[in-house]
Amino acid sequence: MTGRRTRLGDWGETMAARFLARRGYEVLARKWRCAAGEIDIVARHDGDLVFVEVRTRRGRDPGMAAESITNAKRARLMALADAFLAAHDLPSNTPWRIDVVAISVGLRAQEVSIEHIPYAVEEA
């Protein structure tokens, strides 16, 4: 990722974490990494672990974010959720889900749209 895209992605993850926290989510980790990859945000909400994929785009409809997750990315996110459970010695029946937070930034930085899509990624 280029420097500009990295900065935009980092900014988006910060905005997403704040957005979720304001809605009662407890943010447990950001940029959690293992050999399988990275989870943008790990949170807890209403007893569930919530793994959050953040999609930050410039000048695009935020609704396109969930559709932008390929089957390969879906499989990777599912594997990452399993890896997180294993790394933290959590039982396999721990309730969890994968959400998407889509952030769209307009041509002017003041034009920001945030959309939270619970259960956006499910097994195919």
From Swiss-Prot:
<dbReference type="InterPro" id="IPR011335">
    <property type="entry name" value="Restrct_endonuc-II-like"/>
</dbReference>
<dbReference type="InterPro" id="IPR003509">
    <property type="entry name" value="UPF0102_YraN-like"/>
</dbReference>
<dbReference type="Pfam" id="PF02021">
    <property type="entry name" value="UPF0102"/>
</dbReference>
<protein>
    <recommendedName>
        <fullName>UPF0102 protein Rcas_2007</fullName>
    </recommendedName>
</protein>
<dbReference type="GO" id="GO:0003676">
    <property type="term" value="F:nucleic acid binding"/>
</dbReference>
<comment type="similarity">
    <text>Belongs to the UPF0102 family.</text>
</comment>
<dbReference type="InterPro" id="IPR011856">
    <property type="entry name" value="tRNA_endonuc-like_dom_sf"/>
</dbReference>
